[in-house]
């Protein structure tokens, strides 16, 4: 198959946000695109599938401006996509990071300083202890705590967004194959091939399909297709609870932003990483923990364990007095696909010339979805910039995994 960069035939493996946004951008630039998803869309087992993912820029400290620029660009694209969706999926109640220290070199201070120096944005406020008590009385604030409040921040209804985006790209001509698991990838000098097992065929035989290029955006299942990369990624179990209460009126968007509580010790290391959302469409409040969970197989049972359930209940009752008599209506687990340094992988697979990898969301990838699609497509068309270089593999996969993020504060995706 002769490679014509003006119009290529490209397969995208995985219909999470990395895969669908890439398919959207490729189709918009005139390429022929097919998306293969091992389950339904949205896949209940995928990292992208949940009720909510935070949109925030106050978590990247002074690492560099790559992430801040990308999330601000992504926010504009989310709004553009939303205008084409049937349902509203983007909400901006603000974001709030609460911590116990605000001095130079502490994560909270450096996040604030970086954004002020680079954005000069009036939406970003520092709330002292008294202001925190007054502004958010539904939260029990400790006497040593202070916060960054960013009115710009918010969240995406992630599972709904994935569904809406799949409908949109399908209407534009992208071929979508649900319940079609890719079992293998091959390359020749002229083409790339997928071996696909489809439930719809009621057969154990594999179908071989030919493409110019393949984009592997299979998240936690990257190892199954590209073991030399996937074996370097850790898949961790992350847990959350959903809460009903007679006091839900105190937790609506107008009264409570997306929040996280990130106390640090004397070594500037995070002690705990709880976060949550205001009242969601489903009528519940979501509370979760962003500390890296246990490493699991992506196909394993994800039921929250008793220890998490107790810790979440204790945290909720301590920090949200109005929820003391509330009911936990459900609990669930999801997965993060973590790189050693928590930065994404957007690069050609090692030893491959026609297989590209978009993976390693590391618990903060969803918000960047629209920008990821553009970055991937730019590389496939040989139009690279600074951001593309930031996510190359290089020697990153040989590093030791971080227990906690070096991006600044933990960055809730849910």
Where are these regions (language model features)?
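Core beta-strand elements of the Rossmann-like FAD/NAD(P) dinucleotide-binding domain
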Residues: 6-8, 202-213
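N-terminal Rossmann-like FAD-binding beta1-loop-alpha1 element of flavoenzymes
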Residues: 8-35
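Active-site substrate-recognition segment that forms the wall
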Residues: 24-29, 56, 86-94, 209, ...
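Glycine-rich FAD pyrophosphate-binding loop
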Residues: 28-48
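Dinucleotide-binding Rossmann-like beta1-alpha1 core, especially the glycine-rich loop
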Residues: 52-135, 273
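Flavin (FAD/FMN) cofactor-binding and adjacent substrate-gating region
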Residues: 80, 101-178, 184-190, 338
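Conserved beta-strand-loop-beta-strand element in the redox core of flavoprotein oxidoreductases
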Residues: 184-208
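C-terminal catalytic lobe of FAD-dependent flavoproteins
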Residues: 315-414
């Amino acid at each position: 198959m002769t490679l014509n960069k003006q119009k290529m035939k490209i397969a995208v493996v995985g219909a999470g946000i990395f895969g669908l946004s890439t398919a959207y951008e490729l189709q918009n630039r005139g390429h022929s695109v097919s998306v293969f998803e091992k389950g339904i869309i949205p896949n209940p087992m995928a990292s992208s599938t949940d009720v909510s993912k935070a949109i925030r820029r106050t978590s990247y400290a002074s690492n560099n401006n790559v992430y801040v620029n990308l999330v601000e660009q992504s926010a504009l694209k989310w709004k553009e996509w939303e205008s084409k969706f049937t349902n509203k999926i983007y909400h901006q109640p603000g974001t709030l990071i609460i911590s116990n220290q605000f001095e130079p070199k502490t994560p909270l201070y450096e996040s604030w300083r970086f954004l002020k120096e680079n954005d000069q944005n009036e939406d970003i406020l520092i709330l002292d202890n008294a202001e925190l008590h007054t502004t958010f009385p539904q939260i029990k604030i400790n006497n040593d705590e202070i916060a960054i409040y960013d009115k710009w921040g918010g969240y995406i209804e992630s599972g709904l967004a994935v569904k809406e985006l799949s409908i949109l790209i399908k209407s534009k001509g992208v071929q979508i194959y649900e319940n079609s698991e890719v079992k293998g990838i091959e390359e020749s000098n002229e083409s790339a091939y997928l071996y696909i097992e489809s439930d719809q065929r009621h057969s154990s035989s594999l179908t071989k399909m030919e493409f110019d290029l393949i984009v592997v955006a299979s998240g936690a299942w990257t190892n199954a297709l590209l073991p030399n990369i996937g074996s370097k990624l850790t898949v961790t179990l992350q847990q959350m609870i959903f809460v009903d209460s007679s006091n839900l009126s105190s937790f609506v968007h107008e009264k409570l932003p997306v929040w996280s509580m990130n106390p640090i010790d004397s070594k500037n290391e995070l002690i705990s990483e709880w976060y949550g959302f205001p009242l969601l469409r489903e009528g519940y409040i979501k509370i979760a923990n962003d500390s890296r969970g246990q490493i699991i197989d992506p196909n394993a049972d994800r039921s929250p364990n008793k220890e998490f359930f107790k810790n979440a209940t204790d945290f909720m009752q301590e920090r949200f007095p109005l929820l003391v008599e509330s009911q936990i209506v459900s609990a669930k687990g999801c997965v993060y696909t973590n790189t050693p340094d928590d930065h994404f992988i957007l690069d050609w697979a090692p030893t491959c010339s026609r297989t590209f990898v978009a993976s390693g969301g590391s618990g903060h990838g969803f918000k960047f979805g629209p920008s990821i699609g553009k970055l991937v497509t730019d590389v496939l068309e040989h139009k690279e910039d600074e951001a593309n270089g930031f996510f190359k593999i290089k020697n990153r996969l040989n590093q030791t995994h971080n227990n906690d993020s070096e991006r600044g504060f933990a960055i809730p995706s849910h």
